[in-house]
């Protein structure tokens, strides 16, 4: 039966007990990590959020010793005892490895059943089981450390931004649904039957309205929601570090955020981030890396060989060029002897990313070539191609030929795959960069129209405003993303603050004047009353902390994450609700054809 802790007051957390306390009486509380019964002595590893402290029970203590025999993993206990230097071997792996507490008083505050998995880091437990018993999983030291790191990050950001003049303001979570972007999570209104709120995908419009309201610098640690397919770095509910600034341009936003990141990484990780961070245009990022979030910790950059092969005899290359495409390649240094089976796997990978195929050329150590297309080209053409690729004996050259979008996607993905396989990435590097000058619009084959690459409120570059009426594909945006080691940490833009440009932007995206005012009338009305130039940025907090913690999945830095089908294995959400609730909301559940069958 559980005992009360009445009369006991914790004097220290586990790792707060140190050599300085030798000879003193302490009161500590926590969970039983491990029990070792040596006959006349029982050793208990006591665990709390800070770490492990060794407790010792001696058979000479009679009643306390007998009670200690009952202890099992995950029992919650409170003890009083004296700190002493360890008699036996010192445990260098523990902060408290050279001391122990000889226990005089033991209270069992709560017993535990045998947990479904050991509460320790080095255990091979299925992730679904970990998430089902997340409250146990969260006791593990790594997750304790990760969530403490997350807390440290948000605390630092709030303090730094407050000193920079930012005001923290909360924006609504019950919002108006808008059609652009990912699917909304909808919330039915009981008071307005048949009408719905949307949970915010971001506080975008509200933070712009705060600039209209004169708050100058806004920040919020904001919860956001998107009903989209999950990946390793995506969740249906996530957290943004959201900010907006008035009377600024791109350089001002970049400056404050570079200083924030530099100070935060130094304070929390003791990592020096050099400033200024590199900047490259979106076009340069795609041409060099095949990605708008390039990992610059290694080379293997894309090379455009279109001009070199445009008149060659290989129809795959020339055909792609004649259809308005390009031919690009990557040089995989020192892999010219790669077995054909591995090359075939690369070809399959390329096809999986949209390629019709993948051409390769191996440069043998004697300078001769082994290639899938050598017979279609003259020796001079091959030599020129190898020269353009800076090929040397022992190298493997890979080529894709198609529309730019496909070639970038194929070679960008291959570049990352090969870098991981060949262990080319220095995991100790923190390579930040800014990608700027994004296209304002991108063509959607599915919708057969231009859509906003970022969102409809991004300001075009002034010199490209003329193309809003003539050629949307030429319009560049005053948009910027911050990238770390191949992951987009955040993105932002200078916003449109003139009503006429905003209306023209919405018109270019296919909104009628009536639709624009129905969806965004409150913003367009605000533009009638004096709007400062403004810009902003939002970080994905989960992704940022994931990188800082050295994790590969954001679920490892979120207390209660969802799985890939957006469900919670611990609470079984989402779940059916009773008919009375549905009636109050005037909702009928329509069964799909498969359910009816």
Functional labels for PLM-detected ranges:
Residues 1-597:
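Class II aminoacyl-tRNA synthetase catalytic cores and aaRS-like
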């Amino acid at each position: 039966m559980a005992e009360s802790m009445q009369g006991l007051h914790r004097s220290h957390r586990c790792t707060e007990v140190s050599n300085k306390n030798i000879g003193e009486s302490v009161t500590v509380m926590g969970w039983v990590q491990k029990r070792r019964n040596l006959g006349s002595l029982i050793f208990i590893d006591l665990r709390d959020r800070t770490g492990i402290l060794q407790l010792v029970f001696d058979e000479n203590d009679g009643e306390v010793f007998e009670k200690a025999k009952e202890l099992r993993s995950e029992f919650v206990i409170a003890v009083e005892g004296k700190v002493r230097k360890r008699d036996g071997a010192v445990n260098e792996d523990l902060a408290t490895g050279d001391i122990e507490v000889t226990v005089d008083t033991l209270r069992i505050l709560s017993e535990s059943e045998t947990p479904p998995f050991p509460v320790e880091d080095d255990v091979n437990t299925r992730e679904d089981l970990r998430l089902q018993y997340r409250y146990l999983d969260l006791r593990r030291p790594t997750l304790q450390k990760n969530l403490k790191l997350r807390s440290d990050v948000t605390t630092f950001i709030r303090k730094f931004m407050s000193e920079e003049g930012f005001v923290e303001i909360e924006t609504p979570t019950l919002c108006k649904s808008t059609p652009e972007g990912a699917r909304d999570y909808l919330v039915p209104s009981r008071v307005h039957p048949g009408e719905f709120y949307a949970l915010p995908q971001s506080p975008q419009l509200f933070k712009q309205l705060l600039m209209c309201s004169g708050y100058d610098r806004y920040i919020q640690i904001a919860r956001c929601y998107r009903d989209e397919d999950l990946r390793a770095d995506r969740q249906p509910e996530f957290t943004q570090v959201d900010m907006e600034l008035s009377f600024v341009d791109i350089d001002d936003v970049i400056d404050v955020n570079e200083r924030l990141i530099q100070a935060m990484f130094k304070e929390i990780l003791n990592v020096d981030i050099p400033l200024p961070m590199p900047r490259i245009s979106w076009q340069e990022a795609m041409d060099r890396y095949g990605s708008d979030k390039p990992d610059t910790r290694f080379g293997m950059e894309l090379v455009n060989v279109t001009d070199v092969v445009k008149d060659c005899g290989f129809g795959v290359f020339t055909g792609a060029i004649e259809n308005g495409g390009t031919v690009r390649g990557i040089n995989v240094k020192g892999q010219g002897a790669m077995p054909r089976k591995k090359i075939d796997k690369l070809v399959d990978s390329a096809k999986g990313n949209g390629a019709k195929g993948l051409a390769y050329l191996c440069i043998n150590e004697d300078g001769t070539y082994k290639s899938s297309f050598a017979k279609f080209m003259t020796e001079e053409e091959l030599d020129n191609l190898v020269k353009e690729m800076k090929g040397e004996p022992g190298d493997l050259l890979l080529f894709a030929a198609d529309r730019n979008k496909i070639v970038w996607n194929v070679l960008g993905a291959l570049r990352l795959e090969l870098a991981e396989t060949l262990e080319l990435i220095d995991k100790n590097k923190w390579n930040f960069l800014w990608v700027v000058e994004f296209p304002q619009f991108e063509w959607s084959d599915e919708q057969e129209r231009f859509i906003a690459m970022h969102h409809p409120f991004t300001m075009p570059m002034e010199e490209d405003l003329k193309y809003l009426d003539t050629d949307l594909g030429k319009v560049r945006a005053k948009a910027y993303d911050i990238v770390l080691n191949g992951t987009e940490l955040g993105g932002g833009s200078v916003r449109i603050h003139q009503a006429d440009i905003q209306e023209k932007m919405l018109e270019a995206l296919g909104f009628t004047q009536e639709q624009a005012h129905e969806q965004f009338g409150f913003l367009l009305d605000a533009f009638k009353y004096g709007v400062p130039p403004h810009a902003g940025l939002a970080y994905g907090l989960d992704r940022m902390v994931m990188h800082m913690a050295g994790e590969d999945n954001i679920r490892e830095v979120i207390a209660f994450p969802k799985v890939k089908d957006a469900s919670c294995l611990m609470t079984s959400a989402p779940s059916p609700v009773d008919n009375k609730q549905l009636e109050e909301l005037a909702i009928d559940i329509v069964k799909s054809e498969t359910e009816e069958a």
